[in-house]
Amino acid sequence: MLKLTDITWLYQHLPMRFSLTVERGEQVAILGPSGAGKSTLLNLIAGFLTPASGSLTIDGVDHTTTPPSRRPVSMLFQENNLFSHLTVAQNIGLGLNPGLKLNAAQQEKMHAIARQMGIDNLMARLPGELSGGQRQRVALARCLVREQPILLLDEPFSALDPALRQEMLTLVSTSCQQQKMTLLMVSHSVEDAARIATRSVVVADGRIAWQGKTEELLSGKASASAILGITG
Protein backbone atom coordinates (compact mmCIF):
# COMPACT_ATOMS: atom_id res chain seq x y z
CA MET A 1 0.00 0.00 0.00
CA LEU A 2 2.71 2.47 1.15
CA LYS A 3 6.25 1.68 0.05
CA LEU A 4 9.39 3.72 0.63
CA THR A 5 12.54 2.53 -1.12
CA ASP A 6 15.77 4.19 0.00
CA ILE A 7 14.01 7.55 0.37
CA THR A 8 16.87 9.90 1.25
CA TRP A 9 16.87 13.33 2.87
CA LEU A 10 20.13 15.22 3.26
CA TYR A 11 20.31 16.86 6.68
CA GLN A 12 23.35 19.13 6.88
CA HIS A 13 24.88 16.89 4.18
CA LEU A 14 24.27 13.80 6.32
CA PRO A 15 21.83 11.37 4.67
CA MET A 16 18.71 10.12 6.42
CA ARG A 17 17.60 7.07 4.46
CA PHE A 18 14.41 5.05 4.91
CA SER A 19 12.95 1.88 3.41
CA LEU A 20 9.55 0.83 4.71
CA THR A 21 6.43 -1.04 3.59
CA VAL A 22 3.06 -0.57 5.31
CA GLU A 23 -0.06 -2.52 4.36
CA ARG A 24 -3.53 -1.02 3.98
CA GLY A 25 -5.30 -0.62 7.30
CA GLU A 26 -2.19 -1.14 9.41
CA GLN A 27 -1.63 1.02 12.49
CA VAL A 28 2.09 1.57 12.96
CA ALA A 29 3.95 3.49 15.68
CA ILE A 30 7.15 5.38 14.79
CA LEU A 31 9.41 5.49 17.85
CA GLY A 32 12.93 6.65 18.61
CA PRO A 33 15.08 9.23 20.41
CA SER A 34 14.68 12.97 19.84
CA GLY A 35 16.38 14.05 16.62
CA ALA A 36 16.48 10.50 15.26
CA GLY A 37 14.46 11.38 12.14
CA LYS A 38 10.90 10.36 13.06
CA SER A 39 9.27 13.62 11.97
CA THR A 40 11.52 13.72 8.89
CA LEU A 41 10.14 10.33 7.87
CA LEU A 42 6.54 11.55 8.19
CA ASN A 43 7.30 14.79 6.34
CA LEU A 44 8.83 12.82 3.46
CA ILE A 45 5.68 10.67 3.25
CA ALA A 46 3.46 13.78 3.36
CA GLY A 47 5.54 15.57 0.72
CA PHE A 48 6.63 18.49 2.92
CA LEU A 49 10.24 17.48 2.25
CA THR A 50 11.60 16.60 -1.19
CA PRO A 51 13.91 13.58 -1.15
CA ALA A 52 17.34 13.70 -2.75
CA SER A 53 16.86 10.15 -4.04
CA GLY A 54 14.74 7.05 -3.65
CA SER A 55 11.08 6.39 -4.40
CA LEU A 56 7.71 6.49 -2.63
CA THR A 57 4.63 4.72 -3.92
CA ILE A 58 1.06 4.57 -2.62
CA ASP A 59 -1.18 1.84 -4.03
CA GLY A 60 1.44 1.26 -6.71
CA VAL A 61 1.43 4.89 -7.89
CA ASP A 62 4.68 6.85 -7.72
CA HIS A 63 4.23 9.88 -5.44
CA THR A 64 7.92 10.67 -4.90
CA THR A 65 7.54 14.20 -6.28
CA THR A 66 3.79 14.73 -5.84
CA PRO A 67 3.10 18.01 -3.96
CA PRO A 68 1.49 17.68 -0.50
CA SER A 69 -1.90 19.02 -1.61
CA ARG A 70 -2.21 16.21 -4.17
CA ARG A 71 -0.96 13.29 -2.10
CA PRO A 72 -3.53 10.81 -0.75
CA VAL A 73 -2.35 11.62 2.77
CA SER A 74 -3.63 13.64 5.76
CA MET A 75 -1.34 14.77 8.59
CA LEU A 76 -2.09 15.97 12.10
CA PHE A 77 0.52 17.92 14.08
CA GLN A 78 0.90 18.91 17.73
CA GLU A 79 0.09 22.45 16.58
CA ASN A 80 -3.47 21.96 15.35
CA ASN A 81 -3.17 24.68 12.67
CA LEU A 82 -6.77 25.80 13.03
CA PHE A 83 -7.67 29.21 11.64
CA SER A 84 -8.56 31.38 14.62
CA HIS A 85 -11.00 33.60 12.67
CA LEU A 86 -13.01 30.67 11.28
CA THR A 87 -15.66 28.68 13.12
CA VAL A 88 -15.30 24.99 13.90
CA ALA A 89 -17.59 24.17 10.96
CA GLN A 90 -15.52 26.30 8.60
CA ASN A 91 -12.24 24.80 9.80
CA ILE A 92 -13.56 21.29 9.18
CA GLY A 93 -15.10 22.36 5.87
CA LEU A 94 -11.67 23.37 4.57
CA GLY A 95 -10.88 19.68 4.39
CA LEU A 96 -13.61 19.32 1.76
CA ASN A 97 -13.35 22.58 -0.16
CA PRO A 98 -10.73 25.33 0.29
CA GLY A 99 -13.35 27.86 -0.81
CA LEU A 100 -15.87 26.50 1.74
CA LYS A 101 -18.51 26.06 -0.97
CA LEU A 102 -19.99 22.79 0.26
CA ASN A 103 -22.86 20.96 -1.38
CA ALA A 104 -25.52 19.12 0.62
CA ALA A 105 -23.63 15.82 0.59
CA GLN A 106 -20.46 17.51 1.82
CA GLN A 107 -22.39 19.32 4.55
CA GLU A 108 -23.79 16.00 5.74
CA LYS A 109 -20.35 14.38 5.66
CA MET A 110 -18.93 17.26 7.72
CA HIS A 111 -21.65 16.98 10.36
CA ALA A 112 -21.34 13.18 10.48
CA ILE A 113 -17.61 13.46 11.24
CA ALA A 114 -18.34 16.16 13.85
CA ARG A 115 -20.83 13.83 15.57
CA GLN A 116 -18.26 11.03 15.49
CA MET A 117 -15.72 13.37 17.15
CA GLY A 118 -18.28 14.56 19.73
CA ILE A 119 -18.03 18.20 18.63
CA ASP A 120 -21.30 18.64 16.74
CA ASN A 121 -22.49 21.09 19.42
CA LEU A 122 -19.42 23.30 18.92
CA MET A 123 -19.74 24.00 15.19
CA ALA A 124 -20.49 27.72 15.56
CA ARG A 125 -17.63 28.41 17.97
CA LEU A 126 -14.18 29.84 17.23
CA PRO A 127 -11.04 27.83 18.12
CA GLY A 128 -10.16 30.30 20.88
CA GLU A 129 -13.35 29.32 22.71
CA LEU A 130 -12.36 25.64 22.86
CA SER A 131 -10.20 23.56 25.18
CA GLY A 132 -6.98 21.99 23.91
CA GLY A 133 -8.63 18.60 23.57
CA GLN A 134 -11.58 20.06 21.66
CA ARG A 135 -9.25 21.86 19.25
CA GLN A 136 -7.45 18.61 18.49
CA ARG A 137 -10.80 16.91 17.85
CA VAL A 138 -11.59 19.63 15.31
CA ALA A 139 -8.19 19.20 13.65
CA LEU A 140 -8.69 15.42 13.56
CA ALA A 141 -12.17 15.88 12.06
CA ARG A 142 -10.66 18.05 9.31
CA CYS A 143 -8.21 15.23 8.51
CA LEU A 144 -10.83 12.48 8.54
CA VAL A 145 -13.36 14.35 6.43
CA ARG A 146 -10.86 14.33 3.55
CA GLU A 147 -11.13 10.50 3.48
CA GLN A 148 -7.54 10.00 2.39
CA PRO A 149 -6.22 6.43 2.73
CA ILE A 150 -3.24 7.40 4.94
CA LEU A 151 -3.28 9.35 8.22
CA LEU A 152 -0.01 10.62 9.70
CA LEU A 153 0.16 11.76 13.34
CA ASP A 154 3.18 13.74 14.55
CA GLU A 155 2.64 13.65 18.33
CA PRO A 156 -0.61 15.66 18.12
CA PHE A 157 -1.76 14.70 21.62
CA SER A 158 1.50 15.02 23.56
CA ALA A 159 0.38 18.24 25.30
CA LEU A 160 -2.83 16.65 26.61
CA ASP A 161 -3.16 15.04 30.03
CA PRO A 162 -2.82 11.20 30.08
CA ALA A 163 -6.54 10.42 30.33
CA LEU A 164 -7.45 12.77 27.48
CA ARG A 165 -4.53 11.50 25.40
CA GLN A 166 -5.73 7.92 25.78
CA GLU A 167 -9.25 9.00 24.81
CA MET A 168 -7.94 10.68 21.64
CA LEU A 169 -5.78 7.68 20.71
CA THR A 170 -8.79 5.38 21.03
CA LEU A 171 -10.84 7.76 18.90
CA VAL A 172 -8.14 7.82 16.20
CA SER A 173 -7.75 4.05 16.19
CA THR A 174 -11.50 3.43 15.97
CA SER A 175 -11.94 6.03 13.21
CA CYS A 176 -9.12 4.52 11.15
CA GLN A 177 -10.62 1.05 11.49
CA GLN A 178 -14.03 2.33 10.39
CA GLN A 179 -12.58 4.16 7.36
CA LYS A 180 -10.01 1.41 6.63
CA MET A 181 -7.26 4.03 6.84
CA THR A 182 -3.56 3.29 7.24
CA LEU A 183 -2.12 5.02 10.31
CA LEU A 184 1.47 6.01 11.07
CA MET A 185 1.97 7.71 14.43
CA VAL A 186 5.15 9.33 15.75
CA SER A 187 5.37 9.09 19.52
CA HIS A 188 7.88 9.30 22.36
CA SER A 189 5.65 7.02 24.42
CA VAL A 190 5.87 3.26 23.95
CA GLU A 191 2.77 2.96 26.16
CA ASP A 192 0.81 5.13 23.71
CA ALA A 193 2.11 3.03 20.84
CA ALA A 194 1.00 -0.17 22.53
CA ARG A 195 -2.56 1.16 22.88
CA ILE A 196 -3.20 1.35 19.15
CA ALA A 197 -0.28 -0.11 17.18
CA THR A 198 0.52 -3.82 17.05
CA ARG A 199 3.56 -2.98 14.92
CA SER A 200 6.29 -0.47 15.71
CA VAL A 201 9.19 1.02 13.78
CA VAL A 202 12.22 2.35 15.67
CA VAL A 203 14.17 5.18 14.03
CA ALA A 204 17.73 5.94 15.13
CA ASP A 205 20.40 8.09 13.47
CA GLY A 206 18.29 8.70 10.37
CA ARG A 207 17.65 5.02 9.69
CA ILE A 208 15.02 2.43 10.53
CA ALA A 209 16.91 0.49 13.17
CA TRP A 210 14.19 -2.07 13.90
CA GLN A 211 10.61 -2.98 13.08
CA GLY A 212 8.37 -5.63 14.51
CA LYS A 213 5.70 -6.34 17.12
CA THR A 214 5.17 -3.59 19.69
CA GLU A 215 4.77 -6.15 22.48
CA GLU A 216 8.24 -7.54 21.71
CA LEU A 217 9.67 -4.04 21.99
CA LEU A 218 7.89 -3.52 25.32
CA SER A 219 9.18 -6.81 26.70
CA GLY A 220 12.75 -5.57 26.44
CA LYS A 221 13.73 -8.56 24.31
CA ALA A 222 13.92 -6.72 20.98
CA SER A 223 17.31 -5.58 19.73
CA ALA A 224 16.01 -1.98 19.67
CA SER A 225 14.48 -2.01 23.16
CA ALA A 226 17.67 -0.54 24.62
CA ILE A 227 17.45 2.41 22.21
CA LEU A 228 14.20 3.35 23.96
CA GLY A 229 15.56 2.63 27.43
CA ILE A 230 13.51 -0.54 27.86
CA THR A 231 15.10 -3.43 29.71
CA GLY A 232 13.78 -6.95 30.04
Curated annotation (Swiss-Prot):
A Pfam family that the UniProt record links to this protein: ABC_tran
Ranges where the ABC transporter domain occurs: 2-230
Alphabetic keyword roster: ATP-binding, Cell inner membrane, Cell membrane, Membrane, Nucleotide-binding, Translocase, Transport
CDD domains listed in its UniProt record: ABC_ThiQ_thiamine_transporter
Membrane topology: Peripheral membrane protein
Enzyme class per UniProt: translocase
EC number(s) stated in the UniProt entry for this protein: 7.6.2.15
Subcellular location: Cell inner membrane
Gene3D superfamilies: P-loop containing nucleotide triphosphate hydrolases
GO molecular function annotation: ABC-type thiamine transporter activity; ATP binding; ATP hydrolysis activity
Reactions this protein catalyses: thiamine(out) + ATP + H2O = thiamine(in) + ADP + phosphate + H(+)
Gene Ontology CC terms, in alphabetical order: plasma membrane
Binding of ATP, residues: 32-39
Primary role: Part of the ABC transporter complex ThiBPQ involved in thiamine import. Responsible for energy coupling to the transport system.
PANTHER family with a match to the protein in the record: SPERMIDINE/PUTRESCINE IMPORT ATP-BINDING PROTEIN POTA, THIAMINE IMPORT ATP-BINDING PROTEIN THIQ
Known partners and oligomeric status: The complex is composed of two ATP-binding proteins (ThiQ), two transmembrane proteins (ThiP) and a solute-binding protein (ThiB).
Family per record: Belongs to the ABC transporter superfamily. Thiamine importer (TC 3.A.1.19.1) family.
Protein name: Thiamine import ATP-binding protein ThiQ
Lineage of producing organism: Bacteria, Pseudomonadati, Pseudomonadota, Gammaproteobacteria, Enterobacterales
Gene that this polypeptide is encoded by: thiQ
